[in-house]
Amino acid sequence: MKRLTLTCALACAAVLAAVVAPALSARSYRPDPVQFSMPASGERALLGNASARGEGVVSKPLRAAKRFNVVGLIWRSGPAEPGIALRTRREGGDWSRWRTVYRHAEDGPDPRTGEPPVRGTASPLWAGEADWVQYRSTTRLPGLRLHFVNVRGTATASERAISALRRGANAGVLAVAGSLAPEAAGAQAGKPAMVSRKDWGASKCQPRDTPSYGQVKAAFVHHTVNANDYSRAEAPDVVLAICLFHRNTNGWDDIGYNFLVDRFGTIYEGRAGGADSEVIGAQAVGYNAQSTGIANLGTHTTVRQTPAAIRAVARIISWKLPLHGAPTSGPVTLVSTGGASNRYPAGRS
């Protein structure tokens, strides 16, 4: 009996070791992302002015096939800037408030770069941990589908159990590694500290193609039109989810932004190719080859960005522009390369 008990204990230990093995690293554990989509369904007329015009719709509550962290919309065609809002909830929980998402047709690759132009897509919304979603729109959107991303290893009950074990094991390894690690080498002079692509999990979102390079004359600052209540621990997951949405839903080569900043003032390296290089992003149609793009994680049309994040954006600009011989103040002339959403035709400055 003792031998049988010992054998069972050893077998259980072996299974447990195999389960946690992927997390036994001195880097933060990142589970494999899960992505899936579903067609929109159960629309009914939206009450109010849009309903009076026969245009607005609201969906029934939709149960996703798996738990998700991010949801976005994609459709075939429609108005340049439809009014769209989403709300989500976890199984057994309360609905979030309705949150507006935007198409932002002006955010995307330059023409003739090989990356597809912006089509009918709404900004991906960070939902935390959610199982249900509902949308409403001021107009019907043909071919509408919902795209979901889970980057936290919580898509199913079994994945949630495995991820909990792996995160626990990883936390122990990180604690030991932190106490033994030598002091980090000094950064490049003037370069702000930032989370590398490797550390926010870009290995799960590999670029489709090699980077292209242009010339940095100016900086475009955006917000990602996302939730503002993400935690410090969730922020790298938000960056990874945006990368996956840009790459796999929009069809771009990589994440569109060159840099991202969270509400805590942490800076993240964006598109691959080198933070100190003039990498062409996908943040301002017609001007990407002449600029760098910085995105604030959150929605800041009604909620102000935090002082820490504003200072982080300033640190990027005050380092990045002089690095490439561009002034940080005063007028700058950019020449448009065109694009369907660009008000200036190609060749106009």
Regions found by a protein language model. Give the residues of each.
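Beta-sandwich interaction modules
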Residues: 26-67, 76-78, 82-149
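Long, well-ordered alpha-helical scaffolding segments within enzyme catalytic domains
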Residues: 65-66, 81-82, 91, 231-250, ...
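Extracellular/periplasmic catalytic domains that process cell-envelope and extracellular macromolecules
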Residues: 64-65, 126-128, 210-215, 250-253, ...
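Exposed low-complexity, polar/acidic, P/S/T/G-rich flexible segments that act as propeptides
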Residues: 67-72, 129-134, 138-199, 204
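Secretory targeting and sorting signals
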Residues: 1-25
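Extracellular structured ligand-interaction cores
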Residues: 68-70, 81-83, 130-132, 143, ...
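Short, conserved "active-site rim" segments that organize catalytic pockets and cofactor/ligand binding
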Residues: 74, 194, 198-276
